[in-house]
Amino acid sequence: MEIIQTTEAFKALVQDIKTSINGYKEPLAFGVCRVDMGQLNLEKTLQATYPVINWNENFGSAAIFIKALQEQGVEIDFTQSEVICNINKAFLKSCLNAFSPYSEEAYGDAHKNIQVISALYNQIATSGSKDGEFKVTFIFADEPLKSVEATYLKLYALSQAKVEIRSINLNGAFGALPNVAWSNGKPLELDYLREFEIELKLANEYPHIEFVDKFPRFLQHIIPADNTRILDTSKVRFGAQLAAGTTVMPGASYVNFNAGTTGAVMVEGRISSSAVVGAGSDIGGGASILGVLSGTDGNPITIGKNTLLGANSTCGIPLGDGCIIDGGLAVFAGTKFHINDAELIELKKVNPNTKFDNYMKGWELAGLHGLHFRQNSLNGQYVVQRSTREIKLNTDLH
């Protein structure tokens, strides 16, 4: 592409690209990434790092990327759910020519895609690059995942809150991602470590392996909000979503991918895959929220606002606002609870559309507000009462 002089000419170019390319389709998501390739299998992508991702936005930049690829002889198949293409210095130069009207404005939070293209062009011009080290990824449909690059793009979208938890298709992610050893943020093929174990150890070059997993850690890719605290990097998996003000303590805490918080939450327990916790809630030490793969029959759990899960409790049903599960208590869908007549009256006040009985199972109480799950210490009976206290976090800590 030639150098574009004005914003009007840029807009005209974008429109021409969209109308002239056969079957053109705007991507759901796209971004430029650097990939880590295998140490033995040089064609195998182990990790994709995106400085900027776009989700249902910045379609003009996408059009320029697609046109620049076309100029390099790359034809995009818009019928595919995901497309990954290698990019080079010529691609970057063509994009910069098209972005010229906006180049002086591309700093801070403005025109992030132009900043990426400019920085990468300068980096390659100075230091060069390996073949296939940099790629552009397009997702055209929210379908099961096929590649590492597209999987990482969706995980970024979750962790950067571009999309809501549980709102995108992550089927295929486990199959697409390789199981690798991680050392200082770098993925290493296990086969490579096995094959060169002797040489690496004799040369005192065997890497310090921090963990082995398909997913990296959240903080390897995401910069959290200023008032978010994560006291142990191993406690949050990449693909988790943490709202501003969330605190993840060390010890028994854990937040899985496609799970997280929608407001300031104290996390000292486990938030399993697809579980969502509302603002002001407290997940006590060792408490567990079951995930779709761990006992909920595939039904994801949402915890409402200002709810307390006591230490070492287990929650297997969705909860509304202002609920309490006492420490050590396990609440499952099939667990039967007693509610006395006086408590029934109080519970109906905050759940007016619910039909209550003296004995109800956990699934019948799912999503209701103001529930206090307890166990009678005299007879062992599980009971539900109206929660009489509002759960509030210490604002100084969040």
From Swiss-Prot:
EC number of the protein: 2.3.1.117
Coiled-coil blocks: none
Reactions performed catalytically: (S)-2,3,4,5-tetrahydrodipicolinate + succinyl-CoA + H2O = (S)-2-succinylamino-6-oxoheptanedioate + CoA
Keyword Amino-acid biosynthesis: yes
Keywords: Acyltransferase, Amino-acid biosynthesis, Cytoplasm, Diaminopimelate biosynthesis, Lysine biosynthesis, Transferase
GO CC terms, sorted: cytoplasm
Listed GO biological process terms: diaminopimelate biosynthetic process; lysine biosynthetic process via diaminopimelate
Chain residues that bind succinyl-CoA: 270, 285, 288, 311, 326-327, 334, 361, 374-377
Main location: cytoplasm
Pfam families: Hexapep_2 (PF14602), THDPS_M (PF14789), THDPS_N (PF14790)
Entry GO MF terms: 2,3,4,5-tetrahydropyridine-2,6-dicarboxylate N-succinyltransferase activity
InterPro entries the UniProt entry points to: Hexapep, THDPS_M, THDPS_M_sf, Trimer_LpxA-like_sf, Type2_DapD
Localization annotation: Cytoplasm
Catalytic residues in the record: 268 (acyl-anhydride intermediate)
Keyword Transport: no
Recorded metabolic or biological pathway in which this protein acts: Amino-acid biosynthesis; L-lysine biosynthesis via DAP pathway; LL-2,6-diaminopimelate from (S)-tetrahydrodipicolinate (succinylase route): step 1/3
Subunit structure: Homotrimer.
Function, in words: Catalyzes the conversion of the cyclic tetrahydrodipicolinate (THDP) into the acyclic N-succinyl-L-2-amino-6-oxopimelate using succinyl-CoA.
Family named by the database record: Belongs to the type 2 tetrahydrodipicolinate N-succinyltransferase family.
Protein name in UniProt: 2,3,4,5-tetrahydropyridine-2,6-dicarboxylate N-succinyltransferase
Gene source species: Sulfurimonas denitrificans (strain ATCC 33889 / DSM 1251) (Thiomicrospira denitrificans (strain ATCC 33889 / DSM 1251))
The encoding gene: dapD
